[in-house]
Structure formats: structure tokens, C-alpha cells
From Swiss-Prot:
Cited PANTHER family: TRANSCRIPTIONAL REPRESSOR NRDR
Descriptive protein name: Transcriptional repressor NrdR
Functional note: Negatively regulates transcription of bacterial ribonucleotide reductase nrd genes and operons by binding to NrdR-boxes.
Residue spans crossing the bilayer: none
Comment on bound cofactor: Binds 1 zinc ion.
PROSITE patterns on file: ATP_CONE
Pfam families the record matches: ATP-cone, Zn_ribbon_NrdR
Zn-finger segments (unnamed): 3-34
């Protein structure tokens, strides 16, 4: 690591610690030439996740967009905000764990529906009606019947 004082290219690590969030490592280094100490940080490089929309367009994953969609489905339902945030956190974590650079919006939609079904059936049906693009009452009825059969 290049010393910021004398620009020598060699240094030694004298102390390493995780940051509070455990997202990076703080290292204290000592220059082998001038003896000055300096701090560096090491972290994993984030790979932006691209969402492939139904029409083939690609856009960056937007956590707030996911949160807004779920909140609309849960509107006027007895679901605490913390629970909704937890659902979004879980989905975001699962997406990151997949280690993919691209993911289909349909896959994200299925993840949301899977979680909403366990939390609140009304919120689930609301989300499904938009996500699955119900065109008429019969599609809505079919989804309700499918939900009732699973119980």
C-alpha cells in the first residue's frame, strides 16, 4: 500500500478491526520507509443488481420501489411497518445471496407473494392482482379459490 506521506510502496499492517456494521475492515498500517502510520479500509465491492422487466428492459434494483409496492398491498391492514421492512430486508438479502448480476422481475414478484401469503391473505391477493395483472373478476376469483384450497 502506497504511503500517503513519503509514497513508498511497502507497509505493514499493525492493527485490523471490523467496522461497526461489519461491512469493512479498518487497517492501521505503518510505512516501512518513513515509519508514519495511516489507515486504510477494505470492503467487498458491491455488484449492482439489474432487474429484467417483463418487456425486456433492464433497470437497477430499487429497494424503495419494492417497499412501496408491498406497502400499497398492505394499506389499511393490521401489519406493522417493521414487518413490512423485514420482508423487504429478507428479499434483498436473498437476492444478494443469489450472487447474480441480473434477476427477472417475475422472480422478485414470486418472492413477495410467498411472504405476503404467510403474513396477510388480503395483502397477498392485492399484490397478486397487480403482479399477475388480473384482467377480470374471474381471474381474481380463481386466485382466491387457489388460496382457499391451500389452507
Amino acid at each position: 500500500m502506497k504511503c500517503p506521506y513519503c509514497h513508498h510502496l511497502e507497509s505493514k499492517v499493525v492493527d485490523s478491526r471490523y467496522t461497526k456494521e461489519h461491512t469493512s475492515i479498518r487497517r492501521r498500517r505503518e510505512c516501512l520507509n518513513c515509519g508514519e502510520r495511516f489507515t486504510t479500509y477494505e470492503r467487498i465491492e458491491d455488484i449492482p443488481l439489474m432487474v429484467i422487466k417483463r418487456n425486456g428492459q433492464r433497470e437497477f434494483f430499487d429497494r424503495n420501489k419494492l417497499l412501496t409496492g408491498i406497502m400499497k398491498s398492505c394499506e389499511k391492514r393490521p401489519i406493522p411497518q417493521e414487518k413490512i421492512e423485514q420482508v423487504v430486508d429478507d428479499i434483498e438479502k436473498e437476492l444478494n445471496n443469489k450472487m447474480k448480476q441480473e434477476i427477472a422481475s417475475t422472480e422478485i414478484g414470486e418472492m413477495v407473494m410467498e411472504r405476503l401469503k404467510d403474513i396477510d391473505e388480503v395483502a397477498y391477493v392485492r399484490f397478486a392482482s397487480v403482479y399477475r395483472q388480473f384482467k377480470d373478476v374471474n381471474k381474481f376469483k380463481q386466485e382466491l379459490e387457489r388460496l382457499l384450497q391451500e389452507d
